[in-house]
Amino acid sequence: MIESSSPTPPALHEGAPADVSHPRNIRSFVRRTGRTTVGQAKAFADVGPRFLLAYSGLPMDFSAVYGRDAPTILEIGFGMGEATAHIAGLMPEKNFLCCEVHTPGVGALLKRIDEQALTNIRILQHDAVEVIDHMLPLGSLDGAHIFFPDPWHKTKHNKRRLIQAPLIAKLAARLKPGGYLHCATDWQPYAEQILEVLSAEPLLKNTADAASDGYAPKPGYRPLTKFENRGIKLGHGVWDVVFTRA
């Protein structure tokens, strides 16, 4: 548990929103509308054919997709792609497979890919849960990122949260031994739930020690985005949870 002397402020969220038509059918997104800018539309046309992947429902061959053998990191819900592009730029030796359904967000990341000349990102504009179920082979991932998923603040909506035991079991099974799962949230009750769910998964081991209550220091590769800085100014805490596959 995290000690707090003041009420937890409402959280903002950037990536990995979640929706559900039934508690047993959790998706990795909530349907949102938004305008695609001229620059984003141009990025779809100019670089989309190279960096957008079609959902096939068939197991992926990462070597064929990226044209090389390299560690592959899954990202679920990247918002407008600010952190994604930053991390991919820091780690050109790694492949990044990024799932997001929000069209302006996909367009924004494509624009960043073009502007920063990134070559190690591929995007699937599809529900990440279905991608995990049908396209990611067991033991194929070197890591997974879920940054600021929709916290679904109301107790009656908690069942809609993305990070629950069934999804984590699927993700853990798709990590290689030594692969990691990194989650971050600015909503204290969700941080507690994430820690509880990951701690209960037998394939995963916490990288943090007891002195930190199970929460990890922010890894250096994860940037403070405009979204996160805005939250900090509003008094939000941010909790990182990092587990590895045993």
UniProtKB/Swiss-Prot annotation:
Residues annotated as binding S-adenosyl-L-methionine: 75, 100, 127, 150
For this UniProt entry, the molecular function terms from Gene Ontology, in alphabetical order, are: tRNA (guanine(46)-N7)-methyltransferase activity
Q: Do you know which CDD domains this protein is assigned to?
A: AdoMet_MTases
Name the residues that bind substrate: 154, 186, 225-228
What are the UniProt keywords, alphabetically?
Methyltransferase, S-adenosyl-L-methionine, Transferase, tRNA processing
The answer to whether keyword tRNA processing applies is yes
Q: Where is this region: Disordered?
A: 1-23
- Decide whether keyword Repressor is in the record: no
| InterPro entries for this protein | SAM-dependent_MTases_sf, tRNA_(Gua-N-7)_MeTrfase_Trmb, tRNA_methyltr_TrmB_bact
Its UniProt pathway annotation is: tRNA modification; N(7)-methylguanine-tRNA biosynthesis
Chain residue ranges for the region called Interaction with RNA:
156-161
Q: Function, please?
A: Catalyzes the formation of N(7)-methylguanine at position 46 (m7G46) in tRNA.
Give the family from UniProt: Belongs to the class I-like SAM-binding methyltransferase superfamily. TrmB family.
What is the protein name given in its UniProt record? tRNA (guanine-N(7)-)-methyltransferase
